[in-house]
């Protein structure tokens, strides 16, 4: 049995992150750790250390799928790990992220008002009106929180769906952060 490290328990962080956002949307900013740290580690380390050791979401999928037997453990369809699908999904994800940043900019510039809504799959509004008390922070900070939490929650649900249908960490095959870090590592290792 391999020795346990502190980072073997980061699946708890994933649960805490989503629970905190459920009660106060401003905790969505903590998700920037999962957004920036993999990129920084890939840029400066030239490896996928984050994906392999620090990704709480991947660990959560392993815990649920393998340990709690919530996965059918069927092989991941080849198209999900194909280069064209991974890059198309990354492009889609970055487009959604860019749209979220643009909406935040519009709120900051006063061109539009704050949209206090969490959306699943960029379409369906989740009725969590209690997650934010208006006026607590500037509107653009809250707008970013709603958008980013929506993005994170949607990706969690996509990961859970493919975890149940296929192998526990099927999400990792086309995770946008994994695709970006892999690209960075390939560039770094060519140097």
Indicate where each model-derived feature is located.
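Non-ligating segments of multi-cofactor redox enzymes
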Residues: 1-191
